[in-house]
Amino acid sequence: MARHKLRIVAVGSTNPVKIEAVKEGFEKVLGAVEVIGVDVISGVSSHPIGLEETYLGALNRAKNAFEKVQCTYAVGIEAGLIKVGEHYIDIHICVVFDGVNETVGLSQGFEYPKIVAEKVLEGIEGGKIAEEISGIKDIGKNIGLIGYLTDNNITRKDLCRESVIMALIPRMIKNAHLY
């Protein structure tokens, strides 16, 4: 029996939440893949502010992962805060890069607690603040602040997976002619 080679997807992170979200998102949309997480530099602050900085972090992660791993696709996921009125909304941006083209997707967003947003704006990484509030060590590699705030009804993996699926929309065969 002939063995088919799985498409390899590199993830610009070693965070198990991001790696599993990429695997689930790709398999739901494009079928079986082998996912490899690699440590890369995002080139942005530890907690990006604004769509552009967050997007740039995801793009850098994807491109840097593509350079490190022989793969079909490379994925970068970056969480960041966007200001809406006087509120700060946490979103995840995913970039899928194939060596030539990139596609982009965003997760749904949620309002960051004011006390957390203020500390992030002072330069403190959101994950550290979330650990203090929740008492959960490495919360960003687990349920995330969203998981804590929603009693696990929505977790960080859900947001990451959602951003991956959104970034894969242009890569679906039925949609290719639209992009």
Curated annotation (Swiss-Prot):
Substrate binds at S13, T14, N15, P16, V17, K18. The keyword Acyltransferase does not apply. It is an enzyme of class 3 (hydrolase). GO terms for molecular function: ITPase activity; metal ion binding; nucleotide binding; ribonucleoside triphosphate phosphatase activity. InterPro entries: ITPase-like_fam, Non_canon_purine_NTPase, NTPase/PRRC1, YjjX_NTPase. It holds the Pfam family NTPase_I-T. SUPFAM superfamilies: ITPase-like. It catalyses: XTP + H2O = XDP + phosphate + H(+); ITP + H2O = IDP + phosphate + H(+). Mg(2+) binds at Q70. It comes from the Archaea. Keywords: Hydrolase, Magnesium, Manganese, Metal-binding, Nucleotide metabolism, Nucleotide-binding. GO terms for biological process: nucleotide metabolic process; thiamine metabolic process. Its cofactor is Mg(2+); Mn(2+). Its EC number is 3.6.1.73. The keyword Oxidoreductase does not apply. Binds 1 divalent metal cation per subunit; can use either Mg(2+) or Mn(2+). Belongs to the YjjX NTPase family. Phosphatase that hydrolyzes non-canonical purine nucleotides such as XTP and ITP to their respective diphosphate derivatives. Probably excludes non-canonical purines from DNA/RNA precursor pool, thus preventing their incorporation into DNA/RNA and avoiding chromosomal lesions. Homodimer. This is Probable inosine/xanthosine triphosphatase. It comes from Methanocaldococcus jannaschii (strain ATCC 43067 / DSM 2661 / JAL-1 / JCM 10045 / NBRC 100440) (Methanococcus jannaschii).
